[in-house]
Amino acid sequence: MENQEADTPITESLSDTPEAECVRQLVGRRHWMKLGIWGALGTIGGGLGYMMAPPAVLPLYFNGLYAFAHESHPPVIHQLVAAANELVGKPYKWGGGHRVLFDNGFDCSGSVSHVLYRAQLLDRPLSSSAFARYAWPGPGCYVTLFVNPGHHVFMQICGLRFDTSGTVTGEGPRWRVASRSYAGFYPRHPAWL
């Protein structure tokens, strides 16, 4: 006769207490603990073999015009934010930022290229089509580029959107708090970010 208790998921075998509810929530979240190569090495060394997922990322400070990274953010986030802040107030210019790093206006891909270049995450400007192959697919922990190949690209840094498209046609690169449609966009992210 088989042991039925061995086949019962831990979340079903817990009593109804506040502590049990906490365990149910933690076990139910797949991202809470991940078994990785370092976790496997930890098991060999006598550890549990699990690594905690990174903590929730703190949002950027935003004063309505400029963004500021928190002191706990990695240095590269500070570089990205500083580079993006330099472009705030520049006008939209089709093709801007592709031939000259410090142009007098920027389009969507030119502004994203400039920000990534200044943080040493890109070695040359890319078009929105080329960004479809940039770095890694999927959203990043700190930085996510949203690419609609051949049409538009924008980025989010710690949840704050840096984009050339907003409520007024012809606005250049700005930090945006208003939501926008993500239909047709594919997320990409720089490695480790």
What are these regions (language model features)?
Residues 70-73, 81, 113-193:
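...with weaker cross-activation on analogous glycine-rich loops/strands in unrelated enzymes
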Residues 86-105, 119:
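Active-site nucleophile-His-acid catalytic modules used for acyl/amide transfer and hydrolysis
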Residues 63-66, 95-100, 130-133:
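Short linear capping/connector segments at secondary-structure termini
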Residues 78, 82-86, 109-114:
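Solvent-exposed, polar/charged alpha-helical surfaces in well-ordered, non-transmembrane soluble domains
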Residues 1-31, 38-46:
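N-terminal secretory signal peptides
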Residues 26-30, 46-75:
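C-terminal segment of N-terminal export signals and the immediately downstream linker at the start
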Residues 70-77, 101-109:
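Solvent-exposed, acidic/flexible segments
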